[in-house]
Amino acid sequence: MVKPRQREYPTLKSSLNIIRETALIAISCVFWIYCLVVLLVYIGTIFEIHDESINTIRVALNIENTEILDIFETMGIFAIIIFVFFTISILIQKWQKGRES
């Protein structure tokens, strides 16, 4: 009788392209820095922080305070509408399940 042996698993040989991986990391870092800058400008606008760097970035991005506040107002209205819609949907589902049982 043949004694059982451990299975031999094939090894995975990987050769990463260093240039491609470096480019992906660089693009990702640039994207995250841009996101942080925009977040900083939005927070500065919401809390009415009049800092020179925030104002400079706002001018470079060609954004006015009123535009940002209008965007947040619109987002708030849509968030309320979606909240009401989903709340009513859940209540209707619970009401229908209550009638069935």
Swiss-Prot record:
Role noted for this protein: Necessary for the synthesis of poly-beta-1,6-N-acetyl-D-glucosamine (PNAG, also referred to as PIA), a biofilm adhesin polysaccharide. Is required for full IcaA N-acetylglucosaminyltransferase activity.
Protein name: Poly-beta-1,6-N-acetyl-D-glucosamine synthesis protein IcaD
One term under GO cellular component: plasma membrane
Origin species: Staphylococcus aureus (strain MRSA252)
Localization per record: Cell membrane
Alphabetical UniProt keywords: Cell membrane, Membrane, Transmembrane, Transmembrane helix
Regions that span the bilayer: 24-46, 71-93
Major subcellular site: membrane
